[in-house]
Amino acid sequence: MGHKVHPTGIRLGIAKDWNSKWYANKAEFASYLAADLKVREMLRKKLAQAGVSKILIERPAKTARVTIHTARPGVVIGKRGEDIEKLRKEVSQLMGVPAHINVTEVRKPELDAQLVAESIAQQLERRIMFRRAMKRSVGNAMRLGALGIKVNVAGRLNGAEIARSEWYREGRVPLHTLRADIDYGFAEASTTYGIIGIKVWIYKGEVFDFSQVGQEKQDDSPRNDRNDRGDRGDRPSRPAREAR
């Protein structure tokens, strides 16, 4: 079933953390959720050129804290912080409470699945061959330390009359392993022939301690070979057979 479920949703609380962190009673839950969706939609539309990876929303004590993970923090902040102040006012208006906006830089965008998917989408819109775009992104991710990456594109590839899907993979992408730290991203490319969907899975290792989610993880060591089983302890030696 690893191929039929959202890779992030099935790992919440195991290897992934929530993008919205707040508690609401039954009467407020729907309005809070709708406000989160509107804020994310507005920010992604206004920051389309800023390389936004994800948007975290927290609601501590009748205020709101929005953290934007982006590959281009300068585009978000603007000249002397003018742009981010405008965003803060719009977010406060949408959420109905005072809002604070924090900006976090994504230092390795080649290892962020959402940014990789958006990069491939932009290349397809510039009429670059889809296979070249896929292989370039896969090569960059593996070069920067990913343990595995898979890219899937679907639609009227190269303007073909019949839509199809093609994928390319390097390394391991264990979708059935719940403790696997798999980053998932999706983007759409609007071409003259129609919409092309891009899905990206990036495997970064395994998570053994949920409290360390979001921090840098060490590469998982390979399993021992069957011959390397270590000492099995003292065993009584068998008596040698007498020659007949």
Curated annotation (Swiss-Prot):
Task: Provide GO CC annotations from the record.
Answer: cytosolic small ribosomal subunit
Which residue windows does the record flag with biased composition (Basic and acidic residues)? Answer: 216-244
What job does this protein perform? Answer: Binds the lower part of the 30S subunit head. Binds mRNA in the 70S ribosome, positioning it for translation.
The protein's assembly and partners: Part of the 30S ribosomal subunit. Forms a tight complex with proteins S10 and S14.
Residues annotated as domain KH type-2 = 39-107
The record's keywords, sorted A to Z, are: Ribonucleoprotein, Ribosomal protein, RNA-binding, rRNA-binding
Protein's gene: rpsC
Molecular-function GO terms, alphabetical: mRNA binding; rRNA binding; structural constituent of ribosome
GTP-binding listed as a keyword: no
Task: Show the InterPro entries listed in the entry.
Answer: KH_dom (IPR004087), KH_dom-like_a/b (IPR015946), KH_dom_type_2 (IPR004044), KH_sf_prok-type (IPR009019), Ribosomal_S3_C_sf (IPR036419), Ribosomal_uS3_bac-typ (IPR005704), Ribosomal_uS3_C (IPR001351), Ribosomal_uS3_CS (IPR018280)
Keyword flag Electron transport = no
A Pfam family recorded for this sequence: Ribosomal_S3_C
Family recorded in the similarity comment:
Belongs to the universal ribosomal protein uS3 family.
The organism's superkingdom is given as Bacteria
List the HAMAP family: Ribosomal_uS3_B (MF_01309_B)
One biological process GO term for this chain?
A: translation
Protein's name according to its UniProt entry? Small ribosomal subunit protein uS3
Region described as Disordered: 213-244
